[in-house]
């Protein structure tokens, strides 16, 4: 299981790149200075038109990690309510190599 860094020291509200998720279990990890920011793992069931939060376990207001299980979809990280000193990084890993790609 390898981690892919999908967010590198983000300092503004916005979204990471979109990643194709084949299917199965994974893990999201976020770290950094939050300063009021909220970080959410989101999925799109329709190739990027609609985005919904994966769940409360993968919504962060402080550094942490969470497991998730989703069917084939696109994934991204959403950051909102950043503060003056917010600087956040995030990683996603898959249970099986090759389950995630740009």
Would you name each region that the model predicts?
Residues 13-22, 53-101:
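Beta-sandwich interaction modules
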Residues 28-32:
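Aromatic/hydrophobic beta-strand junction motif of beta-rich domains
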Residues 33-38:
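Short proline/glycine-enriched turn/loop motifs at strand-loop junctions of beta-rich domains
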Residues 3-14:
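Extracellular beta-rich ligand/substrate-recognition surface
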């Amino acid at each position: 299981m390898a981690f892919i860094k999908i967010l590198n020291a983000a300092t503004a509200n916005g979204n990471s790149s979109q990643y194709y998720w084949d299917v199965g279990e994974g893990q999201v990890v976020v770290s950094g200075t939050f300063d009021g920011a909220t970080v959410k793992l989101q999925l799109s069931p329709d190739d990027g038109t609609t985005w919904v939060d994966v769940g409360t376990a993968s919504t962060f207001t402080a550094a942490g990690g969470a497991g998730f299980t989703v069917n084939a979809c696109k994934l991204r990280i959403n950051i909102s309510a950043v503060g003056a000193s917010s600087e956040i990084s995030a990683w996603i890993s898959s249970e099986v190599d090759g389950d995630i790609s740009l």
